[in-house]
Amino acid sequence: MLRFLSPESAEVTGFATGNPATISVNAAQWPVLTAAMPAPGIFGIADCRSAVMFQASAITTGAGTVQITVRNTGVNKIAFDGSDTFASGQARLYRAESFIYYIGRNRAGEPTLFRARFNVLPGADDVVLDTGLAEEVVEGVENMQLLFAQDIVTNPAQAPTGVINGIRTAAGLLPDSNSQAGWQRVGGVQVGLLVRGNDRAAAQQKTAPTRSLGTRLQLPADGRYRSVYETNIALRNRLYGN
Protein backbone atom coordinates (compact mmCIF):
# COMPACT_ATOMS: atom_id res chain seq x y z
CA MET A 1 0.00 0.00 0.00
CA LEU A 2 1.17 3.50 -0.87
CA ARG A 3 -0.12 6.50 1.08
CA PHE A 4 0.75 10.10 0.21
CA LEU A 5 -0.68 13.59 -0.13
CA SER A 6 -1.84 14.79 -3.52
CA PRO A 7 0.37 17.26 -5.40
CA GLU A 8 -2.70 19.51 -5.72
CA SER A 9 -3.75 21.62 -2.75
CA ALA A 10 -6.12 24.40 -1.72
CA GLU A 11 -5.56 27.36 0.58
CA VAL A 12 -6.84 27.07 4.15
CA THR A 13 -8.54 30.36 5.00
CA GLY A 14 -9.71 29.46 8.52
CA PHE A 15 -9.11 26.82 11.19
CA ALA A 16 -10.76 26.20 14.56
CA THR A 17 -9.93 23.26 16.85
CA GLY A 18 -12.43 21.33 18.93
CA ASN A 19 -14.95 18.54 18.50
CA PRO A 20 -16.19 19.41 15.99
CA ALA A 21 -13.33 21.30 14.40
CA THR A 22 -13.91 23.44 11.32
CA ILE A 23 -11.60 24.09 8.39
CA SER A 24 -12.41 26.77 5.82
CA VAL A 25 -10.96 26.38 2.32
CA ASN A 26 -10.79 28.75 -0.64
CA ALA A 27 -13.74 27.69 -2.82
CA ALA A 28 -12.01 28.78 -6.02
CA GLN A 29 -9.23 26.25 -5.38
CA TRP A 30 -11.46 23.42 -4.14
CA PRO A 31 -12.01 21.84 -7.61
CA VAL A 32 -8.35 20.75 -7.82
CA LEU A 33 -9.02 18.37 -4.92
CA THR A 34 -12.09 16.80 -6.53
CA ALA A 35 -10.85 16.51 -10.12
CA ALA A 36 -9.33 13.04 -9.67
CA MET A 37 -11.86 11.90 -7.03
CA PRO A 38 -15.34 13.49 -7.04
CA ALA A 39 -16.08 12.86 -3.35
CA PRO A 40 -12.83 12.66 -1.36
CA GLY A 41 -13.19 12.13 2.37
CA ILE A 42 -9.62 11.77 3.65
CA PHE A 43 -7.46 14.88 3.70
CA GLY A 44 -4.21 16.23 5.08
CA ILE A 45 -3.69 19.77 6.34
CA ALA A 46 -0.09 20.93 6.41
CA ASP A 47 2.19 23.93 6.71
CA CYS A 48 5.97 24.21 6.91
CA ARG A 49 5.94 22.83 10.49
CA SER A 50 3.61 19.82 10.60
CA ALA A 51 0.88 17.81 8.91
CA VAL A 52 -2.27 16.09 10.20
CA MET A 53 -4.42 13.50 8.40
CA PHE A 54 -8.17 13.34 9.04
CA GLN A 55 -11.54 12.28 7.67
CA ALA A 56 -14.07 14.97 6.82
CA SER A 57 -17.30 14.43 8.75
CA ALA A 58 -19.19 16.88 6.52
CA ILE A 59 -18.37 19.24 3.65
CA THR A 60 -20.46 22.36 3.02
CA THR A 61 -20.05 24.76 0.11
CA GLY A 62 -20.82 28.43 0.73
CA ALA A 63 -20.15 31.81 -0.83
CA GLY A 64 -16.46 31.74 -1.65
CA THR A 65 -15.71 29.16 1.06
CA VAL A 66 -15.85 25.40 1.48
CA GLN A 67 -16.24 24.44 5.14
CA ILE A 68 -15.08 21.05 6.38
CA THR A 69 -16.39 19.78 9.70
CA VAL A 70 -14.25 17.23 11.55
CA ARG A 71 -15.66 15.16 14.44
CA ASN A 72 -14.32 12.26 16.46
CA THR A 73 -16.37 9.81 14.38
CA GLY A 74 -15.86 7.51 11.41
CA VAL A 75 -12.19 6.65 11.03
CA ASN A 76 -11.10 9.62 13.16
CA LYS A 77 -9.84 8.19 16.45
CA ILE A 78 -9.19 11.56 18.10
CA ALA A 79 -10.42 15.12 17.66
CA PHE A 80 -8.36 18.16 16.72
CA ASP A 81 -6.94 19.54 19.97
CA GLY A 82 -4.95 22.65 20.83
CA SER A 83 -1.69 21.09 19.60
CA ASP A 84 -3.06 20.92 16.06
CA THR A 85 -3.11 24.59 15.09
CA PHE A 86 -2.62 25.92 11.59
CA ALA A 87 -2.56 29.60 10.69
CA SER A 88 -4.82 30.78 7.88
CA GLY A 89 -2.91 31.81 4.78
CA GLN A 90 0.01 29.53 5.68
CA ALA A 91 -1.59 26.07 5.66
CA ARG A 92 -2.76 24.09 2.63
CA LEU A 93 -5.31 21.29 2.33
CA TYR A 94 -4.37 18.15 0.39
CA ARG A 95 -6.28 15.07 -0.67
CA ALA A 96 -4.87 11.99 1.08
CA GLU A 97 -4.29 9.17 -1.38
CA SER A 98 -4.28 5.43 -0.61
CA PHE A 99 -3.22 3.07 -3.40
CA ILE A 100 -2.55 -0.66 -3.50
CA TYR A 101 -0.38 -2.01 -6.33
CA TYR A 102 -0.65 -5.72 -7.11
CA ILE A 103 -0.15 -8.29 -9.87
CA GLY A 104 -3.26 -9.89 -11.33
CA ARG A 105 -4.84 -11.09 -14.58
CA ASN A 106 -6.69 -8.74 -16.91
CA ARG A 107 -9.72 -9.70 -18.99
CA ALA A 108 -7.46 -11.12 -21.70
CA GLY A 109 -5.78 -13.37 -19.14
CA GLU A 110 -2.48 -11.49 -19.30
CA PRO A 111 -0.46 -10.78 -16.13
CA THR A 112 -0.85 -7.10 -15.33
CA LEU A 113 0.19 -4.55 -12.74
CA PHE A 114 -3.00 -3.12 -11.21
CA ARG A 115 -3.62 -0.08 -9.04
CA ALA A 116 -6.57 0.17 -6.65
CA ARG A 117 -7.48 3.53 -5.10
CA PHE A 118 -9.32 3.59 -1.78
CA ASN A 119 -11.41 6.28 -0.13
CA VAL A 120 -13.62 6.89 2.88
CA LEU A 121 -16.57 9.10 1.99
CA PRO A 122 -17.23 12.13 4.22
CA GLY A 123 -18.98 10.99 7.40
CA ALA A 124 -18.84 7.29 6.43
CA ASP A 125 -17.42 4.43 8.48
CA ASP A 126 -16.18 2.09 5.75
CA VAL A 127 -13.22 2.12 3.39
CA VAL A 128 -14.40 1.69 -0.21
CA LEU A 129 -12.75 1.05 -3.57
CA ASP A 130 -13.00 4.28 -5.54
CA THR A 131 -15.17 3.84 -8.68
CA GLY A 132 -15.57 0.19 -7.67
CA LEU A 133 -12.84 -0.92 -10.09
CA ALA A 134 -9.07 -1.34 -10.03
CA GLU A 135 -7.03 0.34 -12.77
CA GLU A 136 -4.76 -1.54 -15.19
CA VAL A 137 -1.36 0.16 -15.13
CA VAL A 138 1.04 -2.01 -17.17
CA GLU A 139 0.29 -5.25 -19.00
CA GLY A 140 2.90 -7.99 -19.00
CA VAL A 141 4.17 -7.54 -15.43
CA GLU A 142 4.58 -11.02 -13.94
CA ASN A 143 6.40 -10.41 -10.66
CA MET A 144 7.02 -7.57 -8.20
CA GLN A 145 9.71 -7.58 -5.51
CA LEU A 146 10.05 -4.98 -2.75
CA LEU A 147 12.88 -4.24 -0.33
CA PHE A 148 12.84 -1.57 2.36
CA ALA A 149 15.71 0.65 3.53
CA GLN A 150 15.71 1.38 7.25
CA ASP A 151 17.33 4.08 9.34
CA ILE A 152 20.47 3.11 11.22
CA VAL A 153 18.50 3.66 14.46
CA THR A 154 15.50 1.31 14.62
CA ASN A 155 14.80 1.70 18.34
CA PRO A 156 11.52 3.69 18.53
CA ALA A 157 12.66 5.24 21.83
CA GLN A 158 15.56 6.98 20.06
CA ALA A 159 15.51 9.72 17.43
CA PRO A 160 16.18 8.64 13.83
CA THR A 161 19.32 9.85 12.08
CA GLY A 162 18.25 9.92 8.43
CA VAL A 163 21.17 7.58 7.64
CA ILE A 164 20.25 4.31 5.92
CA ASN A 165 22.32 1.23 6.72
CA GLY A 166 20.05 -1.76 6.12
CA ILE A 167 17.98 -3.16 3.22
CA ARG A 168 15.38 -5.65 4.42
CA THR A 169 12.28 -7.53 3.35
CA ALA A 170 8.93 -6.63 4.90
CA ALA A 171 9.18 -9.64 7.21
CA GLY A 172 12.68 -8.66 8.32
CA LEU A 173 12.03 -5.07 9.41
CA LEU A 174 13.42 -4.08 12.82
CA PRO A 175 12.47 -4.08 15.61
CA ASP A 176 9.26 -5.83 14.53
CA SER A 177 7.64 -6.07 11.10
CA ASN A 178 4.18 -6.08 12.70
CA SER A 179 4.69 -2.83 14.60
CA GLN A 180 4.24 0.75 13.48
CA ALA A 181 7.70 1.66 14.79
CA GLY A 182 9.54 -0.47 12.25
CA TRP A 183 7.70 0.99 9.28
CA GLN A 184 8.23 4.54 10.52
CA ARG A 185 11.99 4.01 10.19
CA VAL A 186 11.77 3.12 6.48
CA GLY A 187 13.51 5.82 4.43
CA GLY A 188 13.61 4.18 1.02
CA VAL A 189 12.11 1.43 -1.14
CA GLN A 190 13.66 -0.75 -3.83
CA VAL A 191 11.25 -2.02 -6.49
CA GLY A 192 11.89 -4.84 -8.96
CA LEU A 193 9.47 -5.74 -11.77
CA LEU A 194 9.66 -8.74 -14.11
CA VAL A 195 8.05 -7.83 -17.44
CA ARG A 196 7.41 -10.20 -20.35
CA GLY A 197 6.79 -9.56 -24.05
CA ASN A 198 3.48 -10.23 -25.75
CA ASP A 199 4.88 -12.58 -28.41
CA ARG A 200 7.42 -15.35 -28.57
CA ALA A 201 10.97 -14.17 -29.21
CA ALA A 202 12.86 -15.35 -32.30
CA ALA A 203 16.24 -15.05 -30.61
CA GLN A 204 17.60 -17.76 -28.34
CA GLN A 205 16.82 -17.20 -24.68
CA LYS A 206 19.64 -16.59 -22.22
CA THR A 207 20.60 -19.40 -19.91
CA ALA A 208 21.82 -17.27 -17.00
CA PRO A 209 19.40 -17.17 -14.03
CA THR A 210 17.06 -14.19 -13.82
CA ARG A 211 17.09 -12.27 -10.55
CA SER A 212 15.02 -9.41 -9.20
CA LEU A 213 16.50 -7.58 -6.18
CA GLY A 214 18.56 -10.67 -5.45
CA THR A 215 15.66 -13.13 -5.64
CA ARG A 216 16.10 -15.87 -8.26
CA LEU A 217 13.02 -16.23 -10.43
CA GLN A 218 11.86 -19.46 -12.07
CA LEU A 219 10.74 -18.59 -15.60
CA PRO A 220 8.46 -20.74 -17.78
CA ALA A 221 9.92 -22.12 -21.00
CA ASP A 222 7.41 -20.39 -23.27
CA GLY A 223 9.87 -18.59 -25.56
CA ARG A 224 8.85 -15.08 -24.46
CA TYR A 225 11.40 -12.35 -23.87
CA ARG A 226 11.56 -11.19 -20.25
CA SER A 227 13.46 -8.43 -18.50
CA VAL A 228 13.80 -7.17 -14.94
CA TYR A 229 13.56 -3.45 -14.17
CA GLU A 230 14.74 -2.14 -10.80
CA THR A 231 14.66 1.28 -9.19
CA ASN A 232 15.32 3.00 -5.85
CA ILE A 233 12.82 5.40 -4.27
CA ALA A 234 13.85 7.76 -1.46
CA LEU A 235 11.20 8.86 1.04
CA ARG A 236 12.43 12.41 1.50
CA ASN A 237 10.22 13.25 4.47
CA ARG A 238 11.76 10.31 6.35
CA LEU A 239 15.35 11.14 5.39
CA TYR A 240 15.21 14.86 6.13
CA GLY A 241 13.57 16.30 9.24
CA ASN A 242 12.02 13.01 10.38
Kindly give the residue locations of the regions a language model identified.
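Autoprocessing Asn-cyclization modules and mimics
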Residues: 1-78
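Short linear sequence signals and composition-biased patches located at protein termini or domain-edge surfaces
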Residues: 74-75, 86-114, 119-242
